[in-house]
A protein has these predicted regions:
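Alpha-helical membrane segments of multi-pass proteins
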Residues: 2-322
Length: 322
């Protein structure tokens, strides 16, 4: 008769249970292989994000309608930028099938990060929603909005150096602490991070682009310098992720047991997305700011020339009458 060790039996029974408990809950609902088609087939329109985006779009269009009724023309380009790559950009990564894979593939999460913190906020700023609201609102709500925009909290949070510090610290705080793993395990935290990325991007880019009348805006040289300082951010961040010897999120992604994705390869792709995408957006915005600076300098030069011409003409007229 073979002797059976009760301790070994207990260990063999307990081990799978412990493994199943520590494995991510998402493993029971692993999505199908990621393809272009799945971006559409895995979309979810029945979410609070969809409701929020539709509500914001409706308010914007209502403001445009009020201006049109009052005889004021609102640029169609601004409306297209706000609704298209602005709100549409947010929807493309939070409502489409990408949201199904944001806790499965780090690379998809990085696409979300880029869109929510850098791309969409730029086009939201170009849509000038605050300017639209100030023109469309009745006097009393307009005064309240101005009070909010110029409040101490708004001034402090949107001050360029403060906004720059938050913009720089945010990605490192997410990916180089336990926060990223926590967002993978808790959907509500994941949603809060998305909201924070949008807000941080708006606070950073809106004063730089200078479309809306926000407090604390710097002159063009200061804006260009601040944008220049942000260019290396995503290079350092992307390379750090690509060259990391540990997986971000710990054992979360390996424990999903995906047969169609390798966590290590996906992490390299994720770092490349941050590196390349961040560099492209930063350099593009820097070029736009330099262009604004040059046009502003040209306008100032023409103004000075006109003033000098008026003074010279006045002196000649005075000399002739004398």
């Amino acid at each position: 008769v073979q002797r059976v060790d009760p301790i070994s039996i207990a260990t063999s029974v307990a081990t799978p249970a412990a493994t199943s408990i520590s494995a991510p809950a998402a493993a029971t609902t692993t999505p199908p292989p990621f393809t272009v088609t799945s971006v559409f087939t895995e979309a979810r329109l029945d979410s609070w994000v969809t409701v929020g985006l539709v509500l914001v779009a409706g308010l914007y269009l209502y403001g445009v309608h009020r201006l049109r009724v009052s005889g004021t023309r609102w640029p169609v380009v601004r409306t297209a930028l706000f609704l298209g790559p602005g709100l549409g950009g947010i929807a493309s990564v939070t409502v489409s099938g990408l949201q199904t894979y944001d806790s499965t593939l780090l690379s998809v999460h990085m696409v979300q990060h880029m869109m929510l913190s850098m791309v969409a906020p730029i086009f939201l700023a170009l849509g000038a929603p605050i300017t639209l609201a100030l023109q469309a609102l009745p006097p009393r709500p307009r005064e309240r909005l101005l009070a909010m925009v110029h409040s101490r909290l708004a001034r402090a949070y949107s001050y360029p150096l403060v906004a720059f510090a938050i913009f720089v610290v945010t990605p490192f705080a997410i990916y180089f602490t336990d926060l990223y793993r926590y967002t993978l395990e808790h959907a509500w935290a994941h949603g809060l991070v998305h909201a924070h990325l949008i807000l941080t991007g708006c606070v950073f880019f809106w004063p730089l682009l200078g479309v809306d009348p926000l407090p604390g805006r710097w002159p063009h040289p200061g804006r260009a310098l601040l944008m220049l300082l942000s260019v290396p951010l995503y290079t350092v961040l992307g390379l750090s992720i690509m060259q990391s010897s540990t997986l971000f999120g710990g054992d979360w992604h390996p424990s999903l047991g995906l047969t169609w994705a390798d966590p290590w390869e996906d992490q390299v792709i994720a770092g490349g997305i941050l590196w390349g995408g961040g560099e492209f957006v930063s350099v593009t915005v820097l070029a736009v700011l330099v262009g604004q600076w040059m046009r502003q300098a040209e306008r100032e030069a023409r103004r000075i020339d006109r003033e000098l011409d008026r003074q010279e003409a006045h002196q000649r007229a005075t000399g002739a009458t004398g």
